Design a protein with these regions (language model features):
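Short His-centered aromatic/hydrophobic patch
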Residues: 87-93
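A short, well-ordered alpha-helix in the C-terminal region of glycosyltransferases
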Residues: 223, 250, 330, 337, ...
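Donor nucleotide-sugar binding/catalytic pocket of nucleotide-sugar-dependent glycosyltransferases
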Residues: 134-178, 189, 252-254
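Short hydrophobic beta-strand element within catalytic cores of glycosyltransferases
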Residues: 273, 292, 297, 301-304, ...
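Conserved acidic donor-binding segment of nucleotide-sugar-dependent glycosyltransferases
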Residues: 315-317, 321-328, 337-343
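Nucleotide-activated donor-binding/catalytic signature segment of Leloir-type glycosyltransferases, i.e.
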Residues: 239-261, 271
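Conserved donor-binding/catalytic core segment of Leloir-type glycosyltransferases
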Residues: 7, 140, 181, 189-205, ...
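Acidic donor-binding loop of glycosyltransferase active sites
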Residues: 250, 256, 267-285, 300
Length: 379
C-alpha cells in the first residue's frame, strides 16, 4: 500500500490545537499507510508506543528545512516506501518538498492553520509562503477567511490549487449528557445558569471580556455563573480582574483538564462563549475555533468572537451568535438573551448538534483527506 510521510513540528505529546489536528489527520488514514517524522518531546516514547503507525523522532525539539532533516526524511521515504508527504504546517518544512521529490515522493500537501494569515502580511514570511506554494501540489486552508488571506501571498497557480481541509469533531465523545451534571456538582454549580468557556487562557481568546461583561450579565440573570476551563499565564490577570469587578465569587477557574474529561465540561454549560478578538494588527488571529463546534456537538448555543475563522464555526442566529470581542456590551447581550430564554438556547443547541453531525464529523474529514492525498477531486 502506498504510504504517506507526515513531516511536522507540531505533534503530541506536545499540547495544542495544531498538534491535535495533525495527529487526528494521521489517525484518519489506514494505520499501515502512515509514517510520522516529528521532533523529540518529553513523554514521546510512551505516546509513540500507543500509536498504530510508526513515529520517528528527530533528535531535538525543533525541525528546520536544513540538510540534516532533509537527509533523515529522505531515508524514511526510502525505507518505508512513501510516495506522498503531508507537511503538518506549510512553513517552514514545506521547503523540503523538492528534496523529498528526489527521494521518490510524487505528491506534496502542505496544511495551513491560523497563524499563516499573519505571516502573509510580513514581506519575508510572505515570500516564504509563496515559494512553498509553488513547490507543493496543494496548500490547504481552514475556511474562506484564511483562503482570502493566503491567496494574497501565493502565486495565482498555487492559489488555484488550494483545497479546504478543516478539523472534524468526534460526535460520539462530544454529545449531550456526557457528564455535565457531575462536573456541576463537584464545582458547586448545580442549578445555576452557567456559561462555559474552554480554551487556553491567553488574551486573544477573550476570557477577559467575559469577565468584563459579567457584572451586566449578573445584574440581569440572578445566580449566573461563569466557568473558565483551561490553563495559561493569563490566569492571574483574569483572577485580579474578576476581583476588581467584584464578580470573583461567580467565576470559577477549573484549570487545565485532561482531554478525555472535556466533553463533561462542555456538557455542564447552558451556553458556550469564547469572544476571541484579533490582536497585533492582524498578526494574531483565531483559526477555525474547533471549540465552538465541540460545544455545538454537545448541544450548547455558542457565542463566538469575530476574529479570523471563528465565524466559520457558527451558523449565525441558528447555532449561536458572532460578536465584537472587543466590546463587553456586545458580549453581554447574547449571553443575557440565551440565559433568559432556555427554550431558545436549547433549540439553538439542538440545531448545532445536527449541523456538526451533518458537516463536521471526522469520517467526512477522512474522506476529504484521502482525496487530497491521492489527487482525486475532494468530496
Amino acid at each position: 500500500m502506498p504510504k504517506t510521510l507526515v513531516v511536522t513540528n507540531d505533534y503530541p505529546p506536545r499540547q495544542g490545537g495544531i498538534q491535535s489536528f495533525v495527529h487526528a489527520l494521521a489517525c484518519a488514514r489506514p494505520p499501515d499507510s502512515v509514517v510520522v517524522y516529528a521532533p523529540a518531546w518529553e513523554g514521546a516514547a510512551a505516546f509513540d508506543a500507543r500509536q498504530p503507525f510508526p513515529v520517528i523522532r528527530h533528535r531535538n525539539s525543533l525541525m528546520l528545512p536544513v540538510p540534516g532533516v532533509l537527509h533523515r526524511a529522505q531515508e524514511i521515504v526510502k525505507a518505508h516506501g512513501c510516495d506522498t508527504v503531508l507537511f503538518g504546517a506549510a512553513a517552514p518544512l514545506g521547503l523540503l518538498a523538492p528534496g523529498l521529490r528526489r527521494a521518490g515522493i510524487k505528491r506534496c500537501v502542505a496544511v495551513t492553520h491560523g497563524h499563516e494569515a499573519g505571516w502573509a502580511m510580513l514581506p519575508g514570511a510572505r515570500q516564504l509562503l509563496r515559494r512553498i506554494g509553488d513547490e507543493v501540489d496543494v496548500v490547504t486552508y481552514l475556511g474562506d477567511y484564511f483562503r482570502t488571506r493566503l491567496t494574497r501571498a501565493l502565486s495565482p497557480a498555487a492559489a488555484a490549487r488550494m483545497i479546504r481541509l478543516a478539523p472534524g469533531v468526534d460526535v460520539t465523545e462530544f454529545r449531550p449528557g456526557s457528564g455535565g451534571a457531575t462536573v456541576r456538582e463537584r464545582l458547586g454549580l448545580a442549578g445555576r445558569p452557567l456559561v462555559v468557556c474552554v480554551s487556553r487562557l491567553v488574551p486573544r481568546k477573550g476570557q477577559d471580556m467575559l469577565i468584563r461583561a459579567w457584572p451586566q450579565v449578573r445584574a440581569a440573570i440572578g445566580g449566573a455563573a461563569l466557568l473558565l476551563v483551561g490553563g495559561g499565564t493569563y490566569r492571574a490577570a483574569l483572577e485580579n480582574l474578576a476581583e476588581r469587578l467584584r464578580v470573583k465569587s461567580s467565576v470559577t477557574f477549573a484549570g487545565s483538564v485532561p482531554w478525555r474529561d472535556l466533553p463533561a465540561y462542555y456538557d455542564a454549560g447552558d451556553v458556550f462563549a469564547m469572544p476571541c478578538r484579533t490582536r497585533r494588527r492582524g498578526l494574531d488571529v483565531e483559526g477555525l475555533g474547533i471549540v465552538y463546534l465541540e460545544a455545538s456537538a454537545s448541544g450548547l448555543p455558542v457565542v463566538a468572537g469575530d476574529s479570523g475563522g471563528a465565524p466559520d464555526a457558527v451558523l449565525r442566529g441558528q447555532t449561536g451568535y458572532v460578536v465584537d470581542g472587543r466590546s463587553a456590551a456586545a458580549v453581554a447581550g447574547p449571553l443575557i438573551q440565551l440565559l433568559s430564554d432556555p427554550e431558545r438556547a436549547a433549540a439553538m443547541g439542538r440545531k448545532g448538534r445536527v449541523w456538526v453531525e451533518a458537516e463536521w464529523r471526522w469520517d467526512l474529514v477522512a474522506e476529504r483527506l484521502a482525496a487530497v492525498l491521492s489527487g482525486a477531486p475532494p468530496p
